[in-house]
């Protein structure tokens, strides 16, 4: 390991598959990024001080459970996991920003209720359906280029004002629009839509 301002950096120089387990009650930031580094067992222990988590370019991790290890995290960035299939992010009551992108095998995610989340970016994954329920402060959503995505679950009269779903498989967005009265930005090109009624959303 090498010391840096504000933390410690570990560099894995040899090829191979690693088991990574981390416990650090005072740690505020984790950034595990690499050129498709192989981590077959990624386990994060109790980290009540964690504010920001970045995990990128990792292979051989098929499931990731972030339910209880970082109750005070505010930002999560998980991208370019070549083999990730299932992700759980629950019980993070201070989470504000979620970025889950470029995980081609990710078809299942348990998001739970997050009262402070304002922005959610989940593009270029493998979702066929997605729930946005239990996110009362959510304003901006990017679910673009989930090529199989054809349905959304939404709370009625939510506060979403920007929705990006280009490159998906929606045949209709009528139900989506009905639940989003505050919507003023919509991107929905590259779907299977045959009509688009925006008479109740004149600000778009």
Give the residues covered by each predicted segment.
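Conserved hydrophobic position(s) of the canonical leucine-rich repeat
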Residues: 27, 39, 50, 61, ...
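Leucine-rich repeat
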Residues: 5-8, 37-42, 58-64, 81-86, ...
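Conserved hydrophobic beta-strand positions in leucine-rich repeat
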Residues: 30-32, 42, 51-53, 64, ...
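N-terminal capping/linker segments that flank leucine-rich repeat
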Residues: 1-59, 71, 167-169
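A structural signal for leucine-rich repeat
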Residues: 44-46, 64-70, 88-92, 110-115, ...
């Amino acid at each position: 390991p090498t010391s840096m301002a504000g933390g410690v950096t570990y560099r894995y120089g040899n090829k191979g598959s690693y088991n990574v387990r981390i416990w650090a009650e005072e740690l505020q930031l984790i950034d595990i990024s690499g050129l498709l580094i192989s981590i077959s067992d990624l386990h994060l222990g109790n980290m009540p001080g964690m504010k920001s988590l970045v995990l990128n370019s990792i292979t051989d991790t098929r499931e990731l459970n972030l339910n209880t290890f970082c109750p005070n995290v505010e930002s999560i960035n998980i991208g370019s996991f070549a083999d990730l299939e299932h992700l759980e992010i629950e019980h993070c009551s201070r989470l504000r920003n979620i970025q889950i992108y470029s995980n081609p095998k990710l078809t299942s995610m348990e998001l739970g209720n997050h009262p402070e989340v304002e922005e959610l970016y989940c593009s270029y994954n493998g979702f066929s359906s997605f729930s946005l329920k239990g996110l009362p402060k959510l304003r901006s959503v990017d679910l673009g280029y989930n090529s199989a995505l054809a349905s959304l679950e939404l709370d009625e009269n939510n506060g979403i004002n920007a929705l990006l779903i280009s490159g998906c498989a929606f045949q209709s967005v009528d139900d989506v629009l009905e639940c989003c009265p505050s919507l003023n930005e919509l991107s929905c090109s590259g779907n299977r839509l045959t009509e688009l009624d925006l008479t109740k959303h004149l600000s778009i």
